[in-house]
């Protein structure tokens, strides 16, 4: 090897160090955000010394941080020693930008970063790490996420920022105009619901979330005196009576929960969903086989550290939806980080009498999580039987991304699953 040329060993070592130092890169970004450096630079070219004087900080530390930001492409250095924001920072890191991601990044810098410091413990235990990260034992992960009003607002603002970038895309992946009543389940600040109301003015839209979240949304996220474009309804979607709707939106909800809780929730939604209705699921879907993409794998680890669930493959979401009575699922990638899945309502899961015959099929009984006993699980399950479900590939963007479970043929048996035993007769029009 010629002197000065990088060999394979050197390249591998450079890659290794890049991976090992990744946390330092994140902390440079997080510290600059926390100190407000990008907001200061948004006012015009600014010298590191002036920034240090404004904040009362170490001149040397400020200079080092701003130089690191420059090398990372977050700031631009001028020949006179001043700094300005890069285009990326002006778009995503300045407080007043319509596309700012500042609050989401600050949430990652705090609660999320703290949980990731205990990744090895999370892998050993297979559970969230709030007790180590923030000193709260969290059987219900949202009691830790919403552990104080400032934390609740930071999390809600972070999600609002996410939907400012991605909301329109996932809401137009399918034409939702035929759904007259739309409910955004776990809709937080109402950002996604308000975008739905704007895109589909003929529909009535509501947000359903926990009482403290709804109170915060009304206080901090609605313009004073303005008539809101959506309704806000308070409740617990595992315990409370759910509003009736033609379409339920679950945006980044199912990945919070294990399979039993997902089927429990989806079963409750089946009973609240009107005939001909559907679910719109928004998730970072894993590729077939679950080996990627990397972002979804990292998010799945994050769900282990911060919640009870994980990211899933499209077939996993199809199976969960089918068990709860939403047997036809379409998947689309509208651009951006998330997939959109439309799962259409079928007959109620449980005992179904075949049309034109006296044959019956027995559905399964899945209770999921007992909410009255923290941390308790129920393994009770009945039996499932029946035939007649067929699969056909859905061609999207040139490849088969998922299969669609079609309606059973007349006279066939269908096994379903819900969070309690149900029975009914399969009638014409149930399969929409």
UniProtKB/Swiss-Prot annotation:
A Pfam family for this UniProt protein? Methyltransf_2
Identify its protein family. Answer: Belongs to the class I-like SAM-binding methyltransferase superfamily. Cation-independent O-methyltransferase family.
What upregulates it? Exhibits very slight night/day variation, if any.
This enzyme's EC code(s): 2.1.1.4
The organism's superkingdom is given as: Eukaryota
Q: Where is the active site?
A: 255
Residues bound to S-adenosyl-L-methionine: 146, 163, 209, 235-237, 252
Complex formation = Homodimer.
Q: What does this protein do?
A: Catalyzes the transfer of a methyl group onto N-acetylserotonin, producing melatonin (N-acetyl-5-methoxytryptamine).
- Which reaction is the catalytic activity of this chain? N-acetylserotonin + S-adenosyl-L-methionine = melatonin + S-adenosyl-L-homocysteine + H(+)
Q: What species is this protein from? A: Rattus norvegicus (Rat)
User: Region Disordered: which residues?
Assistant: 373-432
Further comment found in the protein's record: Pineal melatonin synthesis is severely compromised in most inbred strains. In many inbred strains, genetic defects in ASMT have been identified. Melatonin production may have an impact on gonadal development, testis development being significantly promoted in melatonin-deficient C57BL/6J x Mus musculus molossinus animals.
Q: Tell me, which GO biological process terms does this entry list?
A: lipid metabolic process; male gonad development; melatonin biosynthetic process; methylation; negative regulation of male gonad development
Q: In which tissues is it expressed?
A: Expressed predominantly in the pineal gland (at protein level). Very low expression, if any, in the retina.
Q: Which GO MF term does the entry hold, naming one?
A: S-adenosylmethionine-dependent methyltransferase activity
Annotated InterPro entries: COMT-like, O_MeTrfase_dom, Plant_O-MeTrfase_dimerisation, SAM-dependent_MTases_sf, WH-like_DNA-bd_sf, WH_DNA-bd_sf
Name this polypeptide is given: Acetylserotonin O-methyltransferase
Q: What positions does the entry give for substrate binding?
A: 256, 302, 306
| Record PROSITE patterns | SAM_OMT_II (PS51683)
- Record SUPFAM superfamilies: S-adenosyl-L-methionine-dependent methyltransferases, Winged helix' DNA-binding domain
Q: In which pathway does it act?
A: Aromatic compound metabolism; melatonin biosynthesis; melatonin from serotonin: step 1/2
Which keywords does this chain's UniProt record carry? Lipid metabolism, Melatonin biosynthesis, Methyltransferase, S-adenosyl-L-methionine, Transferase
